[in-house]
From Swiss-Prot:
Residues 4-137 form the Resolvase/invertase-type recombinase catalytic domain. Residues 164-183 bind DNA. The gene is tnpR. SMART domains: Resolvase. The lineage of its organism: Bacteria, Pseudomonadati, Pseudomonadota, Gammaproteobacteria, Enterobacterales. InterPro entries: Homeodomain-like_sf (IPR009057), Recombinase_CS (IPR006118), Resolv_N (IPR006119), Resolvase-like_N_sf (IPR036162), Resolvase_HTH_dom (IPR006120), SSR_resolvase (IPR050639). Gene3D superfamilies: Homeodomain-like, Resolvase, N-terminal catalytic domain. This is Transposon Tn21 resolvase. GO terms for molecular function: DNA binding; DNA strand exchange activity. Disulfide bonds: none annotated. GO terms for biological process: DNA integration. Pfam families: HTH_7, Resolvase.
Length: 186
């Protein structure tokens, strides 16, 4: 019995077109995430892993869409193939079944290392671009989530003993952001 063909799509930004990744590829069902490849805790990836069954084939445009880190890529591929799920990477023309040859494992490692290297280059270019923009005065960073008045209110309520987790939720910020506001001088 042959299983389903399941597509996985990941885009990093909301302005990227997810449909083009598996254009012309027939799938029975598709899972799509809008998240960075560095994070493996992606809701639709986790749903796909739970959904896939023995005999199914997961189809992904390219390895870097599944993971940008070699260890994460290997782990995801191994998790799926150990359950009898096949994986196809369209761009690289590679398939993995769990009964792979040493050559197939080498290709996974090499191509995964390229994806990881590409991520490092992207981060480096981003840092350089931000540094240049700061020198020109064009980069100001992200806009603060709270106004000065709201930060003052937040501090007063923390000093009054209110729970920080509850306040973070009420103010619509993460706990880490709350702690950053408490650490910085106004």
């Amino acid at each position: 019995m042959t299983g389903q063909r399941i597509g996985y799509i990941r885009v990093s930004t909301f302005d990227q077109n997810p449909e083009r990744q598996l254009e012309g590829v027939k799938v029975d069902r598709a899972f799509s995430d809008k998240a960075s490849g560095k994070d493996v805790k992606r809701p639709q990836l986790e749903a796909l892993i739970s959904f896939a069954r023995t005999g199914d084939t997961v189809v992904v445009h390219s390895m870097d869409r599944l993971a940008r880190n070699l260890d994460d890529l290997r782990r995801i591929v191994q998790t799926l193939t150990q359950r009898g799920v096949h994986i196809e990477f369209v761009k690289e023309h590679l398939s993995f079944t769990g009964e792979d040859s040493p050559m197939a494992n080498l290709m996974l490692s090499v191509m995964g290392a390229f994806a990881e290297f590409e991520r490092a280059l992207i981060r480096e270019r981003q840092r350089e671009g931000i540094a240049l923009a700061k020198q020109r005065g064009a980069y100001r960073g992200r806009k603060k989530s709270l106004s000065s008045e709201r930060i003052a209110e937040l501090r007063q309520r923390v000093e009054a003993g209110e729970q920080k987790t509850k306040l973070a939720r009420e103010f619509g910020i993460s706990r880490e952001t709350l702690y950053q506001y408490l650490r910085t001088d106004q």
